[in-house]
């Protein structure tokens, strides 16, 4: 009997060996984290990107991307939150992350010198930390640390100004007169008045993001801004009416693109290559992107950067520029409070790595010898990027590898200067050094009661405002009705919303 018992014990031990090996193997499997983020036309974010594969190998974790195409992105974010089944990391705009602040893991104690030294270098600064914290001072997400300020610029065809002997326009009225000359004097020489003096690609949640900066010349922003410590709402400011009158005049005369609400990047590029566009406004890299459209077609085309036009009081500025921590774009990263501890650790490991010197180089430049080279101490992108064999622009080539993607959370000024032309660097320096970047309004953190007021009243105001601003620009509604529009916004509860914003702004400025 004893012999049988020993034999049975031996057989059981042998039988359990595979299970033991399986358990050990299972313990060694990498932790899987999921990341939800916007998959843009000009910035792909999806599984299979080269940088995602490199990050997985370097960090010993598995990363699964949940791509969210940008169309109706706010609705998709709302549905994601409503489901309660969130991925490990969600990347989105700060104000929307803070709207559901309790969904994100508090980071105050997790960002420290020992466990996350690279994040600590940045977020130990109280000025930086408050930009990513809620009204109670709890740090809720990681933002993108930018390297420059002048991200968006005006640019135009200098060769058309020269051809028509037009002086460089300085004021909004000068610009209107130049637009008229472009429309009437046939600079493309085809005998048809098909020129579009100002054309942009649709941008922003309301699609007019690249048109509305003209109003900055009147010293206002479209929504909230601060003036002498007082929070104001630009869309109902008397100066907004003046700005809209100028924009409506341009639109009515065909000087502003009639398709600004619907024109995508492909259509916008086509308008340029069809020799129709004089001027635009977009991210600085597009100065080169547009210029490159003509490199094998025309030799006399000269795309140059331009400073913002001066308004009636001499203001020449844009306000939708980059800040030290960019919180208004889609790449702020919140870690889901319901993730496992292992997933949270892996998520912090990833975020800390992309904030490191090594991670910053990977996500901004790629790998030396393949994507870039160091020449005389300077980072220079390789021909794979600058003269891409598939015909991609330098920026699009980088992003096809996942370089300069949603996970590029620590930007490097060397990147910003390395892949753009001397012309882009010239005009960016002018914007930054000569006062063409207006004051930015901070992303504010609200208490629960304050957020309730915003949810109840501002959502309706914003919808109505978005509808009416476009109607005023396009002449669907006459500007004689601007005062009626203001009265309606006030009736919807603007005073209560402004009181909430003022309280949050005062807290922020302490």
Report each predicted region and the residues it spans.
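Helix-loop-helix "hinge/cap" segment bordering the ligand-binding cleft or interdomain interface
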Residues: 134-207, 225-271, 276, 333-346, ...
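Conserved N-terminal structural module of periplasmic/extracytoplasmic solute-binding proteins
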Residues: 22-175, 207-213, 222-226, 231-235, ...
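Conserved small-residue motifs centered on glycine
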Residues: 38, 349-467, 476
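Glycine-rich, aromatic-lined ligand/substrate-binding cores of catalytic
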Residues: 249-251, 268-292, 299-302, 307-400
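Loop/turn elements at helix/coil->beta-strand transitions in domains of secreted/extracellular proteins
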Residues: 29-33, 59-63, 84-88, 102-105, ...
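Extracytoplasmic/periplasmic substrate-binding proteins
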Residues: 39-45, 50, 55, 150, ...
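Bacterial N-terminal signal peptides
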Residues: 9-20
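Bacterial N-terminal signal peptides that target proteins for export
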Residues: 1-11
